[in-house]
Every structure is written in structure tokens, then in C-alpha cells.
Amino acid sequence: MNTGSPGHDAIHNEIKYYAVLGHDRSISDPSGLARRTFTAEGRLDESLRRDLTWVRSSEIYQWERGENFGPELVEISAGEAEALMERFRQKWAQ
């Protein structure tokens, strides 16, 4: 619901990106990408699939709560996420 206050839409369209660091991976060579979008309806957490589409995921939520005993997540910028998606696009196209 838009209250008409300045910045309201910006808050609800914020996206945070996370590099997924699997076993023996680093921030320079992550194994995946996740994002959290803040919408008027609430948070939407997703992970990038090999076909470069986004699918709902509980990975960020579990990681925040300490329930994820798998990959580590590291917050990255939108620019870094774009560059990472391009790297995955090239890598997964092979």
C-alpha cells in the first residue's frame, strides 16, 4: 500500500544480493547467487538457477537464523551481482 510518503516505493523495491560460497569456494569464485526483494507484500527470497531464472528459496532465511549448515552467504552489490550473473551465463552456456 503506497502511503504517498517520499521513498516508500524505493523501500519496497529494494533488492539485496548474496554470493553463495559452497565448499572450498571464495567470494571471487562463488557457487551461486541468491537475492532478497522487499515488496509491498513482504520479503521474497530467490536463488538463481542454471537456466538463469529465479526460483523461490529459503536459503537466505535459513542462513540468517543459523539453520543453514551448507554454503555461506556474503552480501554483494547489485553491480557485483550483475557481473556474477554474466559469468554464470558464460560458464553455464558451455
Language model features with spans:
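Short intrinsically disordered terminal tails
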Residues: 1-6, 90-94
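Serine/threonine-rich, low-complexity intrinsically disordered segments
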Residues: 5, 17, 39-41
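A general marker of short, structured functional hotspots
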Residues: 13-14, 34, 57, 84
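A short beta-strand micro-motif
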Residues: 13-25
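Broad, structure-driven detector of short, well-ordered beta-strand segments within folded domains
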Residues: 24-41
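Short, mixed-charge low-complexity intrinsically disordered segments
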Residues: 42-94
